[in-house]
Design a protein with these regions (language model features):
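Short alpha-helical scaffolding segments that buttress acidic/His motifs in well-ordered protein cores
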Residues: 196-200, 241-252, 289, 333, ...
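C-terminal charged capping/lid subdomain of soluble metabolic enzymes
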Residues: 308-396
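Short Gly/Thr/Asp-enriched flexible loops that form oxyanion-binding sites at enzyme active sites
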Residues: 51-52, 81-82, 101-114, 146-147
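A glycine/threonine-rich phosphate-anchoring loop and its flanking beta-alpha core
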Residues: 113-209, 303-307, 311
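Active-site segments that bind and position negatively charged phosphate/pyrophosphate groups
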Residues: 202, 206-331
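Glycine/serine-rich anion-binding loops at beta->alpha junctions
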Residues: 90-106, 138-144, 276-279
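ATP/NTP phosphate-donor binding region
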Residues: 1-92, 346
Length: 396
């Protein structure tokens, strides 16, 4: 196990109807003038936004709204939010929604006190200060409610980049599983897929002797298989949604990623898909992850994939041919994704195989490699996209 520091200061408020306490927590963490960031009309139609605004008013907090956040959140609304915060002298940002809303709120939060372009922080500069952010979560998926990360798409360049710093961890997050019951089944399935991706990307490591976090990660994956099936059968199953919501936070606040090398190639490969084709992030991951796993199994990564197959998917270990076990586990994962309605091919997300050379270039690999478990050069990216497209894998 590697040396590590771990800092996770977010205060979590979990359970039914806990969003009614939001105003109290905003005040507790120093807010007096609040920007409420949300997505589309669902927050208004459901009455959630009105309830949030009412509880802020009960605490004598000044609040203004900024709606219109879209999936794969764009830079344009971030600039708009920064200007609004400065005009209104905002001192606290409240995100009401899922990961896209929270990531937008975080980007605004680091942009307000900064004299330059907020995109600097999505191009390598590390933020050192931010307005405080709180969240009311409505979609279990990204884990942004407990993470130090934000992902934004630059509308001009179509770059989909991330910023990371402890100042981006929310002060508090309200998690009411009942708020996710109105989600379309497809969106719920995309969230399940994203949660599993965050778990896998910590699981696939070359760091030895990390049994505690191995077992924690395997436990989350097993729970997602079970609860994912339960919520697909009964979308109003509160307990299934509660477990999924908590898994989304736990798998991405990095308590299960400490002391070990991680591999984020699946997300890296997917980001250009959702940036170019505007597909749901979870859908893109469902297409990319099995292809990435298959590539790893064929290029020296079969041992841990076989462990996953046995411990998570219940496959029998073939000690004479671990790769066979690994491939069996990958097929079991694909079958699960299909069972919850996820796409598995380029065609199903509207991606064109003819664009693969462009997708590879969008990843800005150069002559280097990405990832940790199995390093991927430009040819490897090309091969994985072709596997995801159902093509053979010719050389570039």
């Amino acid at each position: 196990m590697r040396n590590f520091d771990f800092y996770s200061p977010t205060y979590f408020v979990f359970g039914k109807d806990r969003e009614a306490e939001t105003g109290r927590y905003v005040k507790r963490f120093g807010g007096s003038r609040v920007l409420v960031v949300y997505g589309g009309q669902s927050a208004k139609r459901s009455g959630l936004l009105d309830r949030i605004m009412a509880c802020l008013k009960e605490e004598n907090l000044y609040a203004v709204e900024l709606g219109g956040v879209k999936p794969n959140p764009r830079s344009g609304l971030v600039y708009e939010g920064i200007d609004l915060c400065r005009r209104e002298k905002i001192d606290f940002i409240l995100a009401v929604g899922g990961g896209s809303v929270i990531d937008t709120a975080k980007a605004i939060a680091i942009g307000v006190p900064y004299d330059g372009d907020f995109w600097d922080f999505f191009s390598g500069k590390v933020p050192e200060q931010a307005l405080p952010v709180g969240t009311v979560l409505t979609i279990a998926a990204s884990g942004s409610e407990g993470s130090p990360d934000s992902i934004i798409t630059n509308e001009k360049t179509l770059e989909k980049n991330g910023a990371e710093a402890d100042c981006l961890r929310p002060c508090f997050s309200v998690l009411d599983p009942a708020l996710t019951e109105s989600l379309p089944t497809y969106q719920t399935a995309c969230g399940i897929t994203d949660i599993m991706a965050h778990t896998f990307e910590r699981y696939f490591t070359n760091t030895p002797d990390v049994e505690v976090t191995d077992r924690m990660l395997e436990g989350v994956l097993l729970a997602m298989l079970h609860e994912g099936r339960r919520v697909m059968e009964d979308p109003h199953n509160y307990e299934a949604r509660a477990n999924i919501m908590w898994a989304g936070m736990v798998c991405h606040n990095d308590i299960m990623g400490v002391g070990r090398q991680q591999d984020w190639n699946s997300h890296h490969l997917e980001h250009v898909l959702s940036a170019k084709y505007d597909c749901a992030h979870g859908a893109g991951l469902a297409v990319i992850m099995p292809a990435w796993m298959h590539y790893c199994a064929e290029h020296g990564g079969e041992k841990r994939l076989a462990q996953m197959a046995v411990r998570v998917f219940g496959c029998q270990m073939d000690f004479d041919d671990p790769k066979r076990t690994a491939l069996e586990g990958i097929e079991a994962f694909r079958a699960f994704l299909r069972s919850i309605g996820m796409p598995l091919t380029f065609a199903e997300i509207g991606a064109d195989p003819a664009d693969i050379p462009e997708l590879v270039e969008m990843n800005h690999i150069g002559d280097g490699k990405t990832g940790g478990y199995i390093g991927l050069d430009k040819q490897a990216h090309f091969d994985i996209y072709n596997l995801a497209a159902g093509n053979c894998v010719p050389e570039i």
